[in-house]
Amino acid sequence: MIKIDDRSKKQGLKKGENIMRVKRLVSLALAGMLAASVALTGCGSKKEATTSDGKTIVKIGTQQMPNDEGIAKAMNYFQEEMGDSVSVEIVEFSSGKDVNTALAAGSIDFGLEGSCPASLAIAQDLGVELIWIHEVLGDVESLVATGTSGINTVVDLKGKKVAVPFASTAHFSLLKAMENAGLSASDVTVLDMQPDKIYASWNSGDIDAAYIWEPTLSQLSNKKTVITSGELAKAGYMTSNVEVVRTKFAEAHPDIVVAYVKALDKSVSMYKNDESTAIKTIAEAMELTEDNAKFQMSGSTWLTGSEQISSTYLGTSSAKGAVVQNLYDTAEFLKTQGSITKVPDKSVFEKAVNPKYIETALGK
């Protein structure tokens, strides 16, 4: 039986709210906190966690998302692939910030987060590797406007109030959309809000638009879609949800990391080959209707292991793919927002992207 530790519920959050709580005004403090976590973790060697009967405890940090990891959790694929010598614990978080903090402290081994928090983790030298892309974001994350806002295009945002969780993939996409439309930061009032606050502010009429993801996106009533992350991806600004693993853990247990990616590849295969079962699985796990689950799942691009190691994404061990440049560009964005003070050399990101576990899983 997989043990589940839902820390998002302990924080009083509603199920399914994937909250990116990285505040712009405290982003430098966050960077310092992460650095301190690394320093404290390095003060002593951490003994490997085991159960009373000697099984290796593997802690997978996750968020409530309608993706391949959601299927793998529900179908018990992680335990199946990792075997009887491993005890899998699922730890649920509500933001990439919280996932990074847990990774820095060594309290989880794997972590699901957006490409922005992943870039931040690499730039802050948290000792992680990017091993998988859960999904390339499309309609599942979008800029939407209220029906009474008068906003039909990105240009119409001028003089309006737009809410978005800062330092998130949505924030990155919003600012790129504004830049392409010729709008500066002073043209638009951009407000840092968590998804639950966006929902409340939308209903109270306090904001004109929001850039947000599912499931909050579907909960906003009387809305018009202005632009989607899928459209921005086609313009060269790809955002995604990715998986990172602690480098020290991966070096000690490469077989477990291979088993992890096998579980995800199995989930993607289910979605591509048996869509109805995949939709039903996500609907039950996230307490959604099947129609809603189908809508949310179709709003992003799921990649098989073979697709992951193409030049468009992770690439191969001998020739890293476009994700390296994407992470580097994201770090440049994070620097402009004050989330980091320095962008490391691109070689740092190239080293952190590690497709070898997928290659091994595929017998390459």
Sequence positions of predicted segments:
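Beta->alpha turn/N-cap motifs
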Residues: 63-66, 94-96, 106-119, 124, ...
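Flexible hinge/capping segments at coil-to-helix
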Residues: 50-54, 146-161, 247, 251-255
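Secondary-structure end/capping motifs
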Residues: 252-339
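Short helix-initiation/N-cap motifs at beta->coil->alpha
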Residues: 90-101, 114, 183, 188-204
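Extracytoplasmic "Venus flytrap"
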Residues: 52-75, 94-96, 165-169
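Short, low-complexity disordered leader/linker segments with a strong preference
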Residues: 1-57, 359-364
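Conserved C-terminal helix/tail region of periplasmic/extracytoplasmic solute-binding proteins
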Residues: 325-364
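Pocket-lining segment of extracytoplasmic ligand-binding domains
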Residues: 116, 190-191, 197-286
